[in-house]
Amino acid sequence: MFAIIETGGKQILVKKDDFIFIEKIEGEAGQNVVFDKVLLVDDKIGTPFLKNATVTGIIEKQGKQKKIVVYRHNAKSTHKRKLGHRQPYTRVKILEIKG
């Protein structure tokens, strides 16, 4: 059984016992989370979402991704700027798909 959920402005294909990395959501490790924006479950397609369909998971970890370096340089001048960014994420284990 598989489903497509929407979270953090992205659509993610999930299966039971999968680990997914999503944009940070509030909660601590070990806390259950329910995704109710389900677009598809097996052969059922929502318009845009399915009613009475949920995906349940448990938060495994809150963390930050690897640092990316953003470098800005203006041509014909000595202006340079170097920035780093680490995007926060949440790792979730999918426990159950209902629908």
From Swiss-Prot:
UniProt cross-references to InterPro entries, sorted A to Z: bL21-like, bL21-like_sf, Ribosomal_bL21
- UniProt family annotation: Belongs to the bacterial ribosomal protein bL21 family.
- Superkingdom of origin: Bacteria
- What would you give as a GO molecular function for this chain, any one? structural constituent of ribosome
Q: Which organism is the protein's source?
A: Mycoplasma mobile (strain ATCC 43663 / 163K / NCTC 11711) (Mesomycoplasma mobile)
What's a GO cellular component annotated to this UniProt protein? cytoplasm
Q: In its UniProt record, which GO terms are filed under biological process?
A: translation
One family from Pfam that matches here is Ribosomal_L21p
Q: Which UniProt keywords apply?
A: Ribonucleoprotein, Ribosomal protein, RNA-binding, rRNA-binding
Lineage start? Bacteria, Bacillati, Mycoplasmatota, Mycoplasmoidales, Metamycoplasmataceae
Function, in words: This protein binds to 23S rRNA in the presence of protein L20.
Q: How would you summarize the oligomeric state and partners of this protein?
A: Part of the 50S ribosomal subunit. Contacts protein L20.
* Protein name in UniProt: Large ribosomal subunit protein bL21
